[in-house]
Amino acid sequence: MKKIILMLTAVLSLGMASLGFASPASDLLAQEETTTSNVIKLIQGKGQLAEVSTGFSPALQKNFNAAALDNMKKGVTEQLGGISNLKLVRLDKFADADRLVYIGDAKKAPNVQMTFVFSVKGKKAELQGLNLIPVEVKQVQNNQKAQA
């Protein structure tokens, strides 16, 4: 009897967990991650601005032109030496905006943090802005010892 109850609990837990994967927020996150990965590739010299800018807000489409992209690439190359291995480490959700924070490796700095801010209108997410800053990521050690 205990095994049946345990099995039933496990099945229901997995079923409830899968509901989160089908939420509308996951569609927005997929859009945002697609845009961020395309922007990252663009900064690394891969892709075309015209294709990537479809996920931008109208203001960013106007201001982030080829000259601004070249300036950003130059700044990344000079200050960071290039970026790689970016991983999403934080997602902040607000009423009408999302902020995605990525941490990755840089050649001339210990690490780089990229922050992307999206405005959310219904089921559409538009990139409002982004920034890159060099950061130092410190590993936190767990000093707790097992107590007998």
Where are the predicted features?
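Short helix-adjacent coil turns
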Residues: I43-E51
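Bacterial N-terminal signal peptides
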Residues: L8-A17
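Exposed beta-sheet edge and beta->alpha loop/turn motif
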Residues: K93-A148
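Short, low-complexity N-terminal intrinsically disordered segments enriched in polar/charged residues
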Residues: S18-L42
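Positively charged n-region of N-terminal signal peptides that target proteins for export
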Residues: M1-I5
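Short solvent-exposed beta->alpha transition segments
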Residues: A50-A95
